[in-house]
Amino acid sequence: MIKFEKVNYTYQPNSPFASRALFDIDLEVKKGSYTALIGHTGSGKSTLLQHLNGLLQPTQGTVRVGDIVVTSTSKQKEIKPVRKKVGVVFQFPESQLFEETVLKDVAFGPQNFGISKEEAEKIAAEKLEMVGLSKEFWEKSPFELSGGQMRRVAIAGILAMEPEVLVLDEPTAGLDPKARIEMMKLFESIHQTGQTVVLVTHLMDDVADYADYVYLLEKGHIISCGTPSDVFQEVDFLKAHELGVPKATHFADQLQKTGVYTFEKLPITRAELVNLLTSLSVKSGGEN
């Protein structure tokens, strides 16, 4: 689906202000997967994200998106199809809303790619239903809606482009806890339809709950990758890099350090932790 091969990126190359942001990045996003990218500010997440849909081109190396290969010498007309294949929901996407009505805003993208107004509005209606905004909202101004509803409109606008890959950049930033949970459940339901998802986040619990593969970035390098279940076993390594672990993993690790119980494999989700502690309780009860 998407493959990075030895990707390097330097801002303002061949100048006194040259600053290298990515170093020999090898990365793969498989079709139908839910891939997470984790890293602090300055880790290279944003730079990497902009390579996913051709906003940036590698200084060295290649980015393959389907059958399109992007290099340092690719022309804009060659890259444009990538932006239809990969839809990016940037942080606070509601700030990009501008049309008179919700329906018109969501239909704008497809029309911009040459689809008729009638067909674009049909697609927009379908995507608005998908994100949980019923017909009563469609003729309202997007600016009359709540923050969470506005974000859903913006997400529907990206989905209306029918991208093969949906990239989410800190998608729950600024939302209250209830809205955050609802938003993550929405993305999971979209993923369940077969949509390939890339989640850029610093929230380890979201990675544990939803992602099937994760890449950890630090200062432009991938320092670890694998399934969340495997990556989050390296508690000391992650703490050394100030990345932390899911709450369930932290609790289990602390419990293990007391000597009360040794886990064969640390749980990464609350459900896994509850199941393990329940089985421990049952086992202890049976031994008494």
Curated annotation (Swiss-Prot):
Pfam family, one: ABC_tran
Location(s), subcellular: Cell membrane
UniProt keyword list: ATP-binding, Cell membrane, Membrane, Nucleotide-binding, Translocase, Transport
SUPFAM superfamilies in the cross-refs: P-loop containing nucleoside triphosphate hydrolases (SSF52540)
GO molecular function: ATP binding; ATP hydrolysis activity; ATPase-coupled transmembrane transporter activity
Alphabetical list of InterPro entries matching this protein: AAA+_ATPase, ABC_transporter-like_ATP-bd, ABC_transporter-like_CS, ABC_transpr_CbiO/EcfA_su, ECF_ABC_transporter_ATP-bd, EcfA2, P-loop_NTPase
Keyword Nucleotide-binding included in the entry's annotation: yes
UniProt keyword ATP-binding present: yes
Residues that bind ATP: G39, H40, T41, G42, S43, G44, K45, S46
Subunit and interaction comment: Forms a stable energy-coupling factor (ECF) transporter complex composed of 2 membrane-embedded substrate-binding proteins (S component), 2 ATP-binding proteins (A component) and 2 transmembrane proteins (T component).
This enzyme's EC code(s): 7.-.-.-
Predominant localisation class: membrane
The protein's enzyme class: translocase
Name used for this protein in its record: Energy-coupling factor transporter ATP-binding protein EcfA2
